[in-house]
């Protein structure tokens, strides 16, 4: 670039002497002004970024040189939904600590991960979760980065996720599963022949209906009707949110609404309806708990907009993560018929085929059906929902595996790497539920480097809800139906908020057992 625009910008003569202010403005042209603007607002900041990254301690951490100076490789991978594979490839090549982007690293060492998310309980990354908010100043429980504010919100909502309350939701969950069973019965009208169904659509529909009835007081009937506008809009929103976590400038695009207009109206109307019905109708769902603690007075920490945002997170994150865990569990069972056979034997032991009308009860069978739990745990070990972990941030200079980590660095505690660590797990990439039976017998589950729901203060509050839903759904479906593997299905995963199948379809054969 010609150096003259920079001379004008700095107010210098060609010999380096300082110009008078009047001379600077008299000699400015449109071209010089544009070039000076580019230099001041684009080139100069990039130079400072380059120098800051060059002299940062992060420069010594293993990883491609481009990652240490540019966020583009990570942003491109994130945009494609491949950030989990991007990180996995880097760890395989460079080891347990790698640079993902300037100011962002990934750690795959299980001891350091435990230290970050559990022992020292580092705060969530503002660089990531600051972009995961519909209102920057009013985060949801998921997106709080300030520990004290998070603790206040968690205490406010904690009663919604206790074992006792989750157990009270069991009849609502069963009603959705019963609707799913009735739907499959219609499809399997010939008991001697199997029917091909889209398992992904069915399980996701079942999870969405379950969240609908337990959160919003009514099923969305996705299983029976095939679709509903709200879940469809939420799924599209999740794709955008996944990209915005790392590409935050998207939210500054003019005329881009903070909230989807349909979702905004839906959630506002249902909250308004609850308030108008106060006292007349008694609801026992999660939304009612949110409405009960809502306060729109000045200075309130939990207003109507917060109820809307929290309910959307419950619906989107709750249905998506649980559905994917269920779906991947069934896929693994179909690909490992010997495991499926063993699990069916356990199901029949607890719920004999001679008692087809017996209701599936968590209080009766959830803790006793250890092989089912082993199958679920093994699935979440191999295909964790939070594949790259919940990103944390250094509040001071830290040391990880001997490397200095500057204050304000985003650290991804890569649970995917810990779950596949060959020094801890025998044959780590194979599906072996039996490994968990020994772990259970020794009461060592919490001691293992296994964090599908994270850990510490930021452990997923919906963990018990998810396990109860999965137990009811999988046990009931395996009691009633036989599922058969259809070869040739695309099992490629993408990571958008949660790890999920890239395709919208996964076909299986299903028929009635009896």
UniProtKB/Swiss-Prot annotation:
What is this protein identified as? Cytochrome P450 monooxygenase FUS8
The UniProt disruption phenotype note reads: Accumulates 20-hydroxy-fusarin.
Q: Where in the cell is it found?
A: Membrane
* Residues annotated as binding heme: 460
State the EC number(s).
1.-.-.-
Gene name, Swiss-Prot/TrEMBL? FUS8
GO biological process, alphabetically ordered: secondary metabolite biosynthetic process
Q: Quote the InterPro entries the UniProt record gives.
A: Cyt_P450, Cyt_P450_CS, Cyt_P450_E_grp-I, Cyt_P450_sf, Cytochrome_P450_monoxygenase
Q: Which residues are glycosylated?
A: 225, 443
Source organism phylogeny: Eukaryota, Fungi, Dikarya, Ascomycota, Pezizomycotina
Q: Work out whether the entry's keyword set contains Transcription regulation.
A: no
Q: Which GO terms describe its cellular component?
A: membrane
Q: Report the transmembrane regions from the record.
A: 24-44
Q: In which pathway does it act?
A: Mycotoxin biosynthesis
Up-regulation conditions? Expressed under high amounts of nitrogen via regulation by GLN1. Moreover, components of the fungal-specific velvet complex VEL1, VEL2 and LAE1 act also as positive regulators of expression. Finally, expression is induced under acidic conditions in a PACC-independent manner.
Species name? Gibberella fujikuroi (strain CBS 195.34 / IMI 58289 / NRRL A-6831)
């Amino acid at each position: 670039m010609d150096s003259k625009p920079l001379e004008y910008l700095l107010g210098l003569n060609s010999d380096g002497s300082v110009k008078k202010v009047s001379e600077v403005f008299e000699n400015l042209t449109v071209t010089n002004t544009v070039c000076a603007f580019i230099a001041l607002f684009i080139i100069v900041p990039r130079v400072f970024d380059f120098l800051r990254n060059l002299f940062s301690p992060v420069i010594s951490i293993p990883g491609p040189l481009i990652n240490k100076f540019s966020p583009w490789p990570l942003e491109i991978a994130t945009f494609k939904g491949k950030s989990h594979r991007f990180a996995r490839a880097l760890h395989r090549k460079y080891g347990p600590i790698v640079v993902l982007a300037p100011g962002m690293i990934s750690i795959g060492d299980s001891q350091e991960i435990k230290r970050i998310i559990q022992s020292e309980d580092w705060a969530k990354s503002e660089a990531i979760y600051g972009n995961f908010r519909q209102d920057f100043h009013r985060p949801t429980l998921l997106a709080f980065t300030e520990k004290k504010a998070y603790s206040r919100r968690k205490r406010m909502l904690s009663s919604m996720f206790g074992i006792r309350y989750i157990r009270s939701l069991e009849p609502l969950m069963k009603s959705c599963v019963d609707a799913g069973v009735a739907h499959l019965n219609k499809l399997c009208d010939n008991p001697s022949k199997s029917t091909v169904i889209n398992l992904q659509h069915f399980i996701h529909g079942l999870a969405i209906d379950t969240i609908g009835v337990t959160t919003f007081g009514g099923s969305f009937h996705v299983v029976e009707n095939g679709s509903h506008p709200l879940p469809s809009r939420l799924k599209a929103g999740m794709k955008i949110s996944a990209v915005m976590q790392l590409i935050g400038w998207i939210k500054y695009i003019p005329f881009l609404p903070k909230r989807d207009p349909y979702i905004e109206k839906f959630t506002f109307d249902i909250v308004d309806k609850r308030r108008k019905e106060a006292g007349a109708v008694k609801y026992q769902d999660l939304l009612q708990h949110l409405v009960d603690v809502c306060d729109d007075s000045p200075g309130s920490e939990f207003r109507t907009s917060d109820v809307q945002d929290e309910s959307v997170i419950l619906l989107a994150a709750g249905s998506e993560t649980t559905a994917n865990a269920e779906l991947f569990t069934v896929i693994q069972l179909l690909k490992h018929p010997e495991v499926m056979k063993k699990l069916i034997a356990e199901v029949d032991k607890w719920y004999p085929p001679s008692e087809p009308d017996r209701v599936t009860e968590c209080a009766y069978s959830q803790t006793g059906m250890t092989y089912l739990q082993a199958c679920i745990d093994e699935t979440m070990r191999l295909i964790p929902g939070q594949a790259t972990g919940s990103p944390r941030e250094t509040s001071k200079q830290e040391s990880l595996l001997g490397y200095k980590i500057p204050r304000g660095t985003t650290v991804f505690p890569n649970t995917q790497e810990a779950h596949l660590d060959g020094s801890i797990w025998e044959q780590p990439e194979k599906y072996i539920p039996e490994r968990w039976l020994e772990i259970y017998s020794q009461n060592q589950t919490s001691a293992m480097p296994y964090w599908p729901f994270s850990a510490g203060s930021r452990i997923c509050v919906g963990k018990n809800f998810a396990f109860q839903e999965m137990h009811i759904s999988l046990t009931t479906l395996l009691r009633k139906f036989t599922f058969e593997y259809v070869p040739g299905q695309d099992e490629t995963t993408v990571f958008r908020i949660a790890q999920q199948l890239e395709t919208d379809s996964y076909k299986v054969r299903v028929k009635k057992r009896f």
